[in-house]
Amino acid sequence: MVTIRLARHGAKKRPFYQVVVTDSRNARNGRFIERVGFFNPIASEKEEGTRLDLDRIAHWVGQGATISDRVAALIKEVKKAA
């Protein structure tokens, strides 16, 4: 099953997440099909905290991909801000 979820990157105590489309059987930070955005939970006010390619996310959902709870909350937040 294809899923859209967060992959953790960054340093210790400084997380940075990439929003990726991947097979649900792959490891959290393992192989992915496509990167569709990023999320920086500790971004300063002058840095961009979240960027999502909503068109590609809609494409993958149309193909049957499921969305993780956290990514769904990020999508809702981005749409509200736009």
From Swiss-Prot:
PANTHER family: 30S RIBOSOMAL PROTEIN S16, SMALL RIBOSOMAL SUBUNIT PROTEIN BS16M. The gene is rpsP. GO terms for biological process: translation. It comes from Salmonella typhimurium (strain LT2 / SGSC1412 / ATCC 700720). Signal peptide: none annotated. It holds the Pfam family Ribosomal_S16. Belongs to the bacterial ribosomal protein bS16 family. Gene3D superfamilies: 3.30.1320.10. One of its GO terms (cellular component) is small ribosomal subunit. InterPro entries: Ribosomal_bS16, Ribosomal_bS16_CS, Ribosomal_bS16_dom_sf. In addition to being a ribosomal protein, S16 also has a cation-dependent endonuclease activity. Keywords: Endonuclease, Hydrolase, Nuclease, Ribonucleoprotein, Ribosomal protein. This is Small ribosomal subunit protein bS16. GO terms for molecular function: endonuclease activity; structural constituent of ribosome. HAMAP family: Ribosomal_bS16.
